[in-house]
Amino acid sequence: MTAPLPRGTGAAPRARDGFARLVHAEWTKLRTVRRWLLTLVGAVLVTVLVSLFSALGSSSETARGGGPPGPTGADGRPVLDGFSFAYRTLTGDGTVTARVSVPEGDGRGTPDWAKAGLLVKESTRPGADYAALMVTARHGVRLQSAFTRDVAGSAVPPGGLRWLRLTRDGARVTGYESADGRAWHEVGTVDLDGPDSKGPAPHAVPAGFFVTSPDIQSREREFGSASVDQRPTVSTARFDRVRLDGRARPERWRHVGVGGDPRRDAGELRPSGSGFTLSGSGDIAPTTPPNDLAVMALDGVQLGLVLVAAVGVLFVTAEYRRGMIRTTLALSPRRGRVLLAKAVVIGAVSFAAGLVATFTAYLVSADPLRGDDDPPLFGDISLADGPMLRALVGSAAVLALIAVLALGLGALLRGTAAAIAVVVVVFVLPLILLGTLPLDLAHLLQRFTPVAGFAVQGTLPRHDQVATVCLPEEGCYPQGPWTGLLTLAGYAAVVLGAALWRLRRRDA
């Protein structure tokens, strides 16, 4: 009878110890080949120097026109706050109700985010906090506040009508919607004394109905040629059964164009049967800085990856070229574990080198990029912010995944030149072409090729309620940062898996 194995012994621990020895052996190989270490150091230097020179050579212009700065929200960030507003001053609690039509544009088109609805605002000063319940041209009923908060209600078809109601109770404003004016459903509640407000909500506030219509943006590219079109629009909506319950003054509705932009239509309020027709132009929305500090500060990563990939390829092809792979495999009959050990070592070392490269590149590039612009060109993002840390650490992870992918290619092709050429075609060539291809094709490359990993560098906030054009040359990727990084990780896993399959079934 076989005696039971003592606790803590057995095949599994020995296997783990064996793999640890393989990892140590591969690490010893890497650190004793001076050319490989020097190449990794070169990758760090290239990343840092290219990023620095790019920052020193970059120039950005801000359009000030000698006028006053634009409005800012309660958090001090620039916002858009221009719309056509018909209001009365509500002194205390109260309710405003109306049946609102979906806004329609003039002959220049209707933006998807054209808005018509009810509004309670701390004042008519641009940037003041507000609660707005609206019908949009393509996105149904929405309750918005603080320029970034957006709560979806029901869908409303083009040409449709919806009853809307805003009820003020102290600093709390609650939005309701109804299809028939009898059965009401709550959309959400806004606290005008919340953490995003500049102070206590005033006792007397403007309350009424509004219309706004954002610019229509379009950019077309056809293999090097580009056209940019951004034009203001005017939208109109009808408001029936308008009613303001509560103590209010004056007796008549007062019309004002909030924002006062002379380049825009101030809008017009016209009585129409039992209600009003109101037209307007502008937007109530957050603004996004025109440039992404992380993307520009990490410009050198796109060249540094070539050297990192070269080390990944050489880490396996050098043994094939010199015949050492037979000795390596003879010491470990389970061939797959050898390649996995190499992947662990090259991935970890490349990640460490990437951290040094990305953090140093940011530290030397951020100040030249920021310059002395006022307002700041890149918003107020700093190294301590989560998105910036994600961009820096994520870029190091991109370099590590590229090294692992290159290792897999080297094991598959068993030729240094061929494997490095594939890396250049897969990564460098698409990054060069993204700025010249038609947008739809460029976005496909960004989504479904390994360059998707660079989406992790994006730090600009995205707001679903703001229509924007995503341009690859500005570092914009159509997918989220983690989705892009997972796409690259998937490619690395597939290539490494294919290399493992081939290594197990063919002679070295």
Language-model segments: residues:
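Secretory targeting signals
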Residues: 2-16, 41-76, 80-82, 143-147, ...
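Extracellular glycan-recognition regions
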Residues: 15-292, 313-316
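Helix-capping/transition residues at the boundaries of transmembrane alpha-helices
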Residues: 29, 317, 328-330, 406, ...
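Residues that define the loop-to-transmembrane-helix transition and helix capping
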Residues: 37, 336, 417-418
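Hydrophobic/aromatic positions within or immediately flanking transmembrane alpha-helices
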Residues: 40, 326, 339, 420-421
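Central hydrophobic cores of alpha-helical transmembrane segments
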Residues: 41-42, 419-430, 446-451
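Transmembrane helix boundary and interhelical loop/hinge segments in multi-pass membrane proteins
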Residues: 312-336, 343
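Short cytosolic juxtamembrane segments of multi-pass membrane proteins
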Residues: 503-508
